[in-house]
Amino acid sequence: MKSNRIILIDDDEEDCELFITACAELNIPNEVLVFNESKKAFDYLLSMTTQPFFIICDVNMPVIDGLELRKKINENNELRPRAIPFLFWSTSGSGNLINKAYALNIQGFFIKPSTMKGIKEIITAVTLYWDCSYHPIR
């Protein structure tokens, strides 16, 4: 499996802990780097030297929401060409919200599961898919 970091952007501490626990129980070797604010995540993405494995971001975030963060990444001439896989996970997913998200060229939208089993299923599917996919080398 690719060893690059998984970037988790979510202000819900419990959801972050569940995600990290699920990765550990699934023996996912990737470090999970957590940001509870979109601005901090964006600043990190600008400064990073290695490509993340993927970004999974909550839509409902304080100050800069997930949609705005994705828009900022798309508009950035350094980040856009890196084609970092960007996925949303959210507690809600109206058709309108999902349409807005996909208009920003995301690679997936998941409703946060209420069970550890559900979280593990999403993590397994996402990691297997992106492990097989190639990305631009920057």
Which residues fall in each region the model found?
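Conserved acidic segment of CheY-like receiver
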Residues: 4-23
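As written
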Residues: 101-107
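C-terminal output helix
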Residues: 114-124
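CheY-like receiver
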Residues: 123-124, 128-138
